[in-house]
Amino acid sequence: MPPKICVDASLAVKLLVQEPYSDQAASLWQSWIEKDIERIAPAFFPFEVASTIRRKYVREQLTKEEAEEAFTVFTILGFTVLMPEALLKEAWNMARELGL
């Protein structure tokens, strides 16, 4: 079974929008790709990230073009969304493997 990591929405936003620690987030993401680590996320993840991008636009922290570009890049980032049943089982298996 290849290694997996569950991605947090705040990390994904840092990949898409210049924020403090965006460079570190990009380095981390790239290292996961290079190490062939599968990026997984819960079912609500895409909605949480899209909502954050939209909120930044509404609050005028992003231009319309920046928001559109961030969303477009988000759709091609490369992560696997797990539905709740699969996510629950995966979390259980990961905890078991880690001895948690």
Spans of model-derived segments:
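Short, well-structured N-terminal submotif of metal-dependent ribonuclease cores
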Residues: 1-44, 56-69, 93
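Anion (oxyanion) recognition and catalysis
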Residues: 33, 75, 96
